[in-house]
Curated annotation (Swiss-Prot):
Pfam families, A to Z: DUF4534
Keyword Membrane: yes
Protein name (database record): Transmembrane protein 217
Organism annotation: Homo sapiens (Human)
Keywords: Glycoprotein, Membrane, Transmembrane, Transmembrane helix
Phylogenetic classification of the source organism: Eukaryota, Metazoa, Chordata, Craniata, Vertebrata
Amino acid sequence: MKQQQWCGMTAKMGTVLSGVFTIMAVDMYLIFEQKHLGNGSCTEITPKYRGASNIINNFIICWSFKIVLFLSFITILISCFLLYSVYAQIFRGLVIYIVWIFFYETANVVIQILTNNDFDIKEVRIMRWFGLVSRTVMHCFWMFFVINYAHITYKNRSQGNIISYKRRISTAEILHSRNKRLSISSGFSGSHLESQYFERQSFHTSIFTCLSPVPSSAPSTCRYTIDVC
């Protein structure tokens, strides 16, 4: 069966390229952000602005590169798991990748908004936004293939479960009918052996009765009647 293609690629090929793209894009993003976020500027919050939102914003700004590094490491692991999920057709791995990429890009947008004002050079701010928007758009493009392949994998797994369920039912029916035939045949053979046993017993009893000694006053003749079935 010919698989449907989009932009000259099947859903499986697009999913593989999505994982490869994510790994390469995350590496390039870390190289670029290490120079600009490595020495994050942390400023102490004055009591006037000591609110919950200000504390959270200051924490994100101070730990921005460490947060980006942690998220990128998790993203690379999930991308590798995506490639294995394509090979092994694991539906859960595809779903994890879809959910995580959405969370990863959302977190990067938040970090970008909070830290972009710290750079005085306008070109740096433009390059950071250009890289983030380009990566997000490409992830949306590749996500189309991942979602389609996840749908195909789920459908194939459902069909496989139905086939295995029907196979188990047919196997159980065959075993039940076989056991039923065996019980019927064993019943017939048992009744036949029982009838033969009683016939032999009656035959031996008649012979023993005929050969047993009789009184002298009784007739000396003995009639043998043997019925053979």
